[in-house]
Amino acid sequence: EQIASRPPQLSEAIPVTLDEKQQVHIPIEQVKDGKLHRFVWIADDGKAVRFFVINRQPDKLSLAAVFDACLLCGDQGYVMEGNQVVCVGCGVHMFIPSIGKPGGCNPVPIEDWQQTETEILINRASLEEGLNLFSTIVEIDVKDPISGTQMKNTKTEHKYNYEGKTYFFESEKNLDLFRDNPEKYLGKGE
């Protein structure tokens, strides 16, 4: 009886990375079976953005790519129970063909993803739209662009956002040097 009262556990999220064109590639063969396929992209500040792909129709290909979060319940995510997709936050059962449409407890849609003959392509800008939906920060190795010092993103409070990328610094002095003249240091410490 204790098992039934525990909240459903999310299936493991498969890590994805961006290619040189700033896109994630997901093979259709991997996600067309009607089950929920969860992925995670780690932004350069360590924020984990979860999303899933599901085929909405049993007899034909009708894929949806959505963030693993909703506007009502936040980033608790969704689970597959039998052939139902359920919001972990409130327990509502999704009408699977409606996944990909905005509103209610539906997962937040990912904008501007593309489908080719063989794969799904999601660009960085589309994934970044989901940054504010999630709160999990993953510890990653970062490098101070001034000194070249390696550190963990979670172990320094000195960070600065420049042209959509987060940079980390071992000291306030280094942050100030960078902020005053970022072009001088970019390309050197990356």
Task: Describe the residue ranges of each PLM region.
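Short amphipathic alpha-helical patches
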Residues: 91-97, 113-114, 171
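N-terminal pre-ligand scaffold of iron-sulfur
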Residues: 2-78, 100, 109-167, 177-190
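Extracellular secreted precursors and ectodomains with disulfide-bonded cysteine-rich loops/domains
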Residues: 68, 85-88, 103
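Cysteine-rich micro-motifs
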Residues: 84-91, 165-174
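Iron-sulfur (Fe-S) cluster-binding segments and ferredoxin-like electron-carrier domains
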Residues: 77-82, 92-100
